[in-house]
Amino acid sequence: MKKLAIMAAASMIFTVGSAQATFQASGTTGITTLTVTEECRVQVGNVTATLARSKLKDDTAIGVIGVTALGCNGLQAALQADPDNYDATNLYMTSRNHDKLNVKLKATDGSSWTYGNGVFYKTEGGNWGGHVGISVDGNQTDKPTGEYTLNLTGGYWTN
């Protein structure tokens, strides 16, 4: 009996020691994504609007975009227009046919912002959260109908 018990124990040790473990997928995959940003993170919202051509008069509101600037201690939050949306003196929305609709931006809370060469920036540094209004700049009732787009990227202003 002792011999049989020793043989059985040895057999178990051999079986356990020689077994190969394998991974068997049986669930879902989780993904971890990390976005590394500048310290001053400026998030810019979206707006979609429809206006009749007859409404494209000076100061007519097109809409407001939400803007949140965090981690901007001492830095000036800024919005930069795409190269197709400005020239040396004007900011504009562009159509697929490259028609231009002049617009202007203004913070709705009355805070002081400055525009120059495609960049709309807060004149004081620090965090900010609020809305920026987009409105028609000048009488533009002669513009062709169609979809016009203004792309603004959040960032910060450096001197």
From Swiss-Prot:
Q: Does the keyword Signal apply?
A: yes
Question: Major place of localization?
Answer: other
Instruction: Show the stretches that span the lipid bilayer.
Output: none
Q: Write the signal peptide boundaries.
A: 1-21
Alphabetized, the UniProt keywords read: Fimbrium, Signal
One Gene Ontology cellular component term attached to this UniProt record is: pilus
A Pfam family reported for this protein in Swiss-Prot or TrEMBL: Dr_adhesin
- Family annotation (Gene3D superfamilies): Dr adhesin (2.60.40.1570)
- Annotated compartments: Fimbrium
Give the top-rank taxon of the lineage listed in the UniProt record for this protein. Answer: Bacteria
Q: What does this protein do?
A: Hemagglutinins of uropathogenic E.coli mediate adherence to the upper urinary tract. These adhesins bind to the Dr blood group antigen and also agglutinate human erythrocytes in the presence of D-mannose (mannose-resistant hemagglutination (MRHA)). C1845 is a strain responsible for diarrheal disease.
| Family of the protein in this entry | Belongs to the Dr-adhesin family.
Its protein name is F1845 fimbrial protein
What species is this protein from? Escherichia coli
The organism's taxonomy opens as: Bacteria, Pseudomonadati, Pseudomonadota, Gammaproteobacteria, Enterobacterales
